[in-house]
Amino acid sequence: MKLFLILLVLPLASCFFTCNSNANLSMLQLGVPDNSSTIVTGLLPTHWFCANQSTSVYSANGFFYIDVGNHRSAFALHTGYYDANQYYIYVTNEIGLNASVTLKICKFSRNTTFDFLSNASSSFDCIVNLLFTEQLGAPLGITISGETVRLHLYNVTRTFYVPAAYKLTKLSVKCYFNYSCVFSVVNATVTVNVTTHNGRVVNYTVCDDCNGYTDNIFSVQQDGRIPNGFPFNNWFLLTNGSTLVDGVSRLYQPLRLTCLWPVPGLKSSTGFVYFNATGSDVNCNGYQHNSVVDVMRYNLNFSANSLDNLKSGVIVFKTLQYDVLFYCSNSSSGVLDTTIPFGPSSQPYYCFINSTINTTHVSTFVGILPPTVREIVVARTGQFYINGFKYFDLGFIEAVNFNVTTASATDFWTVAFATFVDVLVNVSATNIQNLLYCDSPFEKLQCEHLQFGLQDGFYSANFLDDNVLPETYVALPIYYQHTDINFTATASFGGSCYVCKPHQVNISLNGNTSVCVRTSHFSIRYIYNRVKSGSPGDSSWHIYLKSGTCPFSFSKLNNFQKFKTICFSTVEVPGSCNFPLEATWHYTSYTIVGALYVTWSEGNSITGVPYPVSGIREFSNLVLNNCTKYNIYDYVGTGIIRSSNQSLAGGITYVSNSGNLLGFKNVSTGNIFIVTPCNQPDQVAVYQQSIIGAMTAVNESRYGLQNLLQLPNFYYVSNGGNNCTTAVMTYSNFGICADGSLIPVRPRNSSDNGISAIITANLSIPSNWTTSVQVEYLQITSTPIVVDCATYVCNGNPRCKNLLKQYTSACKTIEDALRLSAHLETNDVSSMLTFDSNAFSLANVTSFGDYNLSSVLPQRNIRSSRIAGRSALEDLLFSKVVTSGLGTVDVDYKSCTKGLSIADLACAQYYNGIMVLPGVADAERMAMYTGSLIGGMVLGGLTSAAAIPFSLALQARLNYVALQTDVLQENQKILAASFNKAINNIVASFSSVNDAITQTAEAIHTVTIALNKIQDVVNQQGSALNHLTSQLRHNFQAISNSIQAIYDRLDSIQADQQVDRLITGRLAALNAFVSQVLNKYTEVRGSRRLAQQKINECVKSQSNRYGFCGNGTHIFSIVNSAPDGLLFLHTVLLPTDYKNVKAWSGICVDGIYGYVLRQPNLVLYSDNGVFRVTSRVMFQPRLPVLSDFVQIYNCNVTFVNISRVELHTVIPDYVDVNKTLQEFAQNLPKYVKPNFDLTPFNLTYLNLSSELKQLEAKTASLFQTTVELQGLIDQINSTYVDLKLLNRFENYIKWPWWVWLIISVVFVVLLSLLVFCCLSTGCCGCCNCLTSSMRGCCDCGSTKLPYYEFEKVHVQ
């Protein structure tokens, strides 16, 4: 990536020595987060210029300006001509430092040319009219994007909507003195890496290909492909229903791009964009192809802090009739609030579409916006998707106006113009992880097998046929009687209601309510009539037929569909299926207004045809020499029809034994036509992710291969040169080389002679050995599997279970076979293995003998004793100040003063001979020394001595601070030296740690390889189960693979027929799975017996069989458990050197006496005329002795000639394998193989010898590394830092006297009030008693009235 560093000291290049060098970009306002490194894309400065006195005019979309001195300058963005209705942008500053700056976006009243900028002052109708103080060296910028003007002011970034701002493409610059300003002309979008700190820009780097955009912006490849490695952060698969969560799937998605248009956050687009990537200011990034696309994908990219980043914006769709507005609001009332969140939103947003037809305004609710909107997709056919899910359908769309801006400079979006293409996608958590285009032959092969990488081997390729094939129809000449049926829907509207359903819909069949076909052929068509009532909403409604419950679609009825009987009706008839008639308003609201009901029966007497025919005719449509889908005399299929020169008198159709159509005769002309398969599946050879060869049935070049070779049974095409000798893969008796060349594979000649010569033979005897550890894995068990047959087949459907009962004991047989095999498996494993309970006891990690692990184990929290200090009440009554002291100065000072402020100076301490006082003084001490200072100033020289205590105390406290700083500096030097030493040791240590980790990683990699081999065995059963589960997706020629869906769509009889197909297919799949499981049990049982033999012979004893316990001479073996099996580690001897000798089977003396070796493992050989014997195991020659030989009768060797029939009389247990297999094959019953591909179970034999060797080498390397690390650790431990400690001193400062006075006054007042309340209430009674006594003794004119008892008087 090419980077340009824009230096912070401006200007650059030729301006550096003439412009003010203090100008920089630290104050540039971009709206980016503080204290962060951010990628910003937009109209930003790159190259800077120094202006002179003349007026300069540039083509620009904006500018940035830096005032560098006490001079005047002016800038204007204009159109180059005067327009009274046009807004212009004008910036000027006054002479002088910190002068005023004028910024205007206004219209001007007179014909100003903007060439001189001298009379551009009379303005009106201003959008922006600012007057502010300039900041020397701070940049000021103005950029234009569409109709949005962005101002980069000194302390803020703001945007304004300016009509026709895109016309302001001329920049006039006037600097009234030389070198009075530095400016940058902006005319292109750039990407900048900006680093901010404390509100300032500390790094400003411009890049052409910034890494920050690689996650969201890419360069489209020439064929419109998205490059490999693109992370698809904000791309989703489009769906009209369920969303794929995880897995690999082949889909048809809009992922072929013709243009990728990045729209930064500092720009906006306000015009319509068309589906051919034209309109507005579309700027494609990289590849561009001028064509009409299917969709436009708007991918929103925002930062994590963009929560509730709301901007006013709308999405406008231009349809054939009118414009439709899409907007969202956080109010469910549907109030027009054109807000679209750019980033995560913290509250729900309700979305509506709005349209205005004539003068009527209509809003329709379409859904709730997701919490985080990452992608918006608009299809040309009217579909609207958010995050991959379809929200509504508008019909055909001509253009889109995505008028959305963001408040954050770091946010942006991209517009991808895409078409639908066949792709293979890997999805994880609904996110696209990988993408493969199914274009080239090899890519199609990958897509056929749903794999992103194919292993080397041969694959069947049958993807050459076109998806859409022409149709061939051939029938016998018959007398045609035709019936035309018109299904008519007439809709009438009334009033001015747009979203209400039609006022009335009349449906009829040829003017009646029902029609039954009585002729041999019929054609039916749907007619929609709209009665014009003057309502403006008529054209917005559409009425069409939907796919209903019939097993055929309405559009296919005329495609030569055959029936025995068929009737149509507009009213429901018992036993009929239906096609609903649906009305939709602008494809947003849907209403069922009727239905077409069909009753039919299977047969061939009535045929639907696309157009009317009558009379005796041969209705045929024959496609020759091309792959076609045919219906020939009721034989249906696909194939290539060719004319033949044969002449056959009998018959009109010719089929094979399997029922396939081979040829037919035209009954009118007598011509014979042959039918061959379209493209028989080819066998392609894949090597290193490419097709290197192909075996085909036709003589033509394919797959980009040119060299064609004709063989007896097939054609072979490749690009090989036919000059190789080594095959990388074999097919039958042919070998395929790396370049695709085809070579014959001949039987390999064995170097071993199976039969020893009677007289002599050349033998190789080992003379040197090496020890080897060989690994062998044997599977001894597999996980038992039990399948609930009824649940698997019927998935709980009760009607399906009733049908399943008719299959008698099918499920019972399957379940019993699995259950019995699992039971036998468990018994065999239990009888074979015994477990030692002591081996599974968990050791206590704290008691490992002499090893103390307490330093590495978690410790319990032990609460330390409380440090002596003041009480809680004292902490409440005093303000505590914590300082760092010198040695014992603070403690000694505190004990000397005993809390008295008057003793402050008298208790001064000395540290290294210098008088010091603690740095903290309370209010009392400050008042005391303030009084001393004021007293020394009252009478000048007479009282100057009174200020001595103040000066001494001040100097002593300054000494305290100075000494404290000195100690800190000394500690800093000690720490720096020790830290540097420690860093050197740590760096060296971690370098060794890095090497050790590297070795460990490589060792773990070898272990991973070994474990993967074991994992393959473990996962075989899971693969089989996965294959069994995948069979549930097959419909087995039923109309659906869902039983419930079948019963929902069809009547009971038809549904039972369809479900019966599912039951048959699923039972067949289940039987195949059970066969696999039983075969696997048999294999595991044999492997278990072999493992038991190896335990007895290899582990418990030493084997004499060469190659049984490892590939060598066995020494000893160790067995360990492994997943589902045992892992044997065989230690064997392997020969490294051999001695070749000419061995003798014996010696013959004078032709009469024969002597042969007594021991079978001895060899007699001759060495330069001297006979010696040696062991076959190890070459140890010695002279023979008499005890080594045994005498035989003579030297003759006699053979007995017998026939194969008589051989069993000599060898009773001899078995002729070939004859046995031949008889077995002849006695096999004839059966038809099920049409299922069975996933093979491969018994895996592991070879971990190379991995173990690597592990041993890595272990030795790790041990050496640990020794080096120990030395480095010792050096690190020696790095001891001895610091001078600053004591932590706590000092309590008393509150001032007036605080205590206030507390005392408050306390006295509260106490008085409390006593008064107690004495004044009845609870105490003191006051009441005293007042009563006094009133009794002397009544001093009390005003209290005496108490009189009232008497009730009745008045007559």
From Swiss-Prot:
Changing residue 70 to K: In strain: Isolate BE03-40001 and Isolate NL. Changing residue 84 to V: In strain: Isolate BE03-1153 and Isolate BE03-64880. Gene3D superfamilies: 1.20.5.300, 2.60.40.3130. It is a single-pass type I membrane protein. The gene is S. This is Spike glycoprotein. Changing residue 190 to I: In strain: Isolate NL. The KxHxx motif seems to function as an ER retrieval signal. One of its GO terms (biological process) is fusion of virus membrane with host endosome membrane. S1 region attaches the virion to the cell membrane by interacting with host ACE2, initiating the infection. Binding to the receptor probably induces conformational changes in the S glycoprotein unmasking the fusion peptide and activating membranes fusion. S2 region belongs to the class I viral fusion protein. Under the current model, the protein has at least 3 conformational states: pre-fusion native state, pre-hairpin intermediate state, and post-fusion hairpin state. Changing residue 503 to R: In strain: Isolate NL. Homotrimer. During virus morphogenesis, found in a complex with M proteins. Interacts with host ACE2.
